[in-house]
Amino acid sequence: MIKFWRDLAGSVLVEYSVVFPTFILVTLGTVDLALMLVDLAAANKATHLGARYAIVSNPVAKEITSPRYTVSQQQQIGQTCFDSASGVANGNCPPAGSLSADCTWAANGGRCTNGYTFDDTAADSYPFTSILTRMQAIYCAHLKPPYTHCPLQRENLTVSYAATGAGYVLRPGGLPLAVTVSLNCMTHQFYFIGALMRWSLAPKEGCAGAVSGWSMPTFASTLTSED
């Protein structure tokens, strides 16, 4: 009986049953973490490229480069939109609030805030689609066009315009704009850890229709429009 109590022949199996699952979790967790970092970097880089392309493309908010001046403002042609001493708006140009728009994709087509027309027509070289396609080429570099299976889709993209306060009255091509390209409601799938741990992660609030998974932060890049 004493000999049986001192028998340690099965101790290796017990140690293995404790160490092996931990080893698998750490190993596969490292792989999942690396893939997550790749996704984060790719999404960030995609917004950089999207902003660069957006500032040299036709605007998605169609009329934003044709500000409406009053008769008295038109008489100030060539005058700056701001006071050179203080840097504040002097009333020579339309208010900055009227020259801003957030353009997103909706189920029935795109829409822009502030009353602007969402433009993604062939006549203007499909500005929204062109920006999206170039961003997909970065985020889903392992896929080929038309990027049907790319996690980055139209619903994730927002193109925003806002007046900078610079420029002068009746400036050709419109007043300078800060163009922001952002990604929202993106999710990341944990391929190994998610299955092993039976994680069920729902998209964050306000992201109806997004694929379930870990909610990535919002990515945004802003550049000033070119002449």
Regions found by a protein language model. Name each.
Residues S17-A41:
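C-terminal juxtamembrane segment of a hydrophobic transmembrane alpha-helix
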Residues H48-D227:
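Short, conserved structural patches
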Residues E15, T47:
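Conserved G/P- and acidic residue-centered "switch" motifs that form tight phosphate/ATP-binding loops
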Residues M1-A9:
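N-terminal leader/signal peptides at the extreme start of proteins
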Residues F4-W5, F23, N44:
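N-terminal hydrophobic or amphipathic segments with adjacent small-residue motifs
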